[in-house]
């Protein structure tokens, strides 16, 4: 395949055209008066969204050089989304501003390497200043404000604040599509796993089709139970105590299942069997989690333990267990709190070490079940199109809130970036390094300009006034008033603002130092013709 090569000014200009096309499509969504973008989908209805990264990922340009520029900025949005979960539009706006200003200066004769050093120096100072003015998030109201600003909906803010309060920082909050119109919160207290009873005859409440066990013993094993004789000794001990029993095993089948169901129906004892959650090594780890949570032991041959010699002392206990056809929930397990804490720390250490996103997600789920809880936000809407858009906004709000809890908050609406302007401007440098610093200074103003522009106002006027206002005072584009941003609840997570600035400067510096761009030449003949597959001598067949 032959290649097209462009050098210096031609190369950078071609990439800038791509940067501008992508950034211009994304930046219309910024701020409280930002608009939506409609994305065509090959199947189903179009997607309407104001999520920067979703828009950026959809954009493919015909010209390969322009497309490379667009993809570089798309990477800024993706990386910011991966790290902070929000702020993708801000990152795109910052990247475009730095690239545009940088190319003007490089075209005018500035050395790109010196400019790059200036950009890096200015951004390092800006990030230090952002950390210095960051305020920790302390109340449920603050969490609600962050989520409301990100999603543009106060009700969503309250919902996410309540979810985070109920499950804690280690809890898992998932977002699902609801069948109805309302958006609601469903919180699962205790440990829940997705395995239900092995037989519907085990239910205690036939209206709700669930089995509720009060203060049960819990037998945990990784073995299949086929023969009732294996568990008879421990069953007899539990019956003597007069308490119900939950059996968690790889499977309970055949004669063992039949005997348990028969005795349950006769009222001899109350027992429910469920399959162990997970598979392979993950199953072993989850069974150990359940054992630690309930103060029991996993009956496994790995530890030299057998079912027929198991005693009541090796069983776990809990205040209550609820089993449905799909799920088992263990509420208030009787495990030792120091052992649970040690297990939580062990899982945290594994999360830090793993390189797999899937493994990290599964470890986070295990951590939540041990330490926090699980909350499900069920998103409702009138149409499928609205549902998708609403779900994306709530996901952004959730990520934004987590970032705020992690690193604190700064004044929102682009105010924080302008408030650190003077500290960055005070940096001493000369020549091309100074040019790099000035490029960053210009870009720090850009989010405020764009928010004002989207609200139908002149950005430059707002920026100039903002520079002379007291620290923390900013422009509320939603109603056109000048207010103390943090007091008014207009806040951004520090992590989101920091990540946007870091990722934008990284890609801008790389693009400015580009001297040649190589792309595949378009194939002018189009795709090769498909050979005729007709079979000779069979022309008469229709």
Curated annotation (Swiss-Prot):
It comes from the Bacteria. It is an enzyme of class 5 (isomerase). GO terms for cellular component: cytoplasm. Keywords: ATP-binding, Chaperone, Cytoplasm, Isomerase, Nucleotide-binding. Its EC number is 5.6.1.7. InterPro entries: Chaperonin_Cpn60_CS, Cpn60/GroEL, Cpn60/GroEL/TCP-1, GroEL-like_apical_dom_sf, GROEL-like_equatorial_sf, TCP-1-like_intermed_sf. It is found in: Cytoplasm. ATP binds at residues 29-32, 86-90, 413, 476-478, 492. Its main location: cytoplasm. It catalyses: ATP + H2O + a folded polypeptide = ADP + phosphate + an unfolded polypeptide. One of its GO terms (biological process) is protein refolding. Pfam families: Cpn60_TCP1. Together with its co-chaperonin GroES, plays an essential role in assisting protein folding. The GroEL-GroES system forms a nano-cage that allows encapsulation of the non-native substrate proteins and provides a physical environment optimized to promote and accelerate protein folding. Forms a cylinder of 14 subunits composed of two heptameric rings stacked back-to-back. Interacts with the co-chaperonin GroES. This is Chaperonin GroEL. The lineage of its organism: Bacteria, Bacillati, Bacillota, Bacilli, Bacillales.
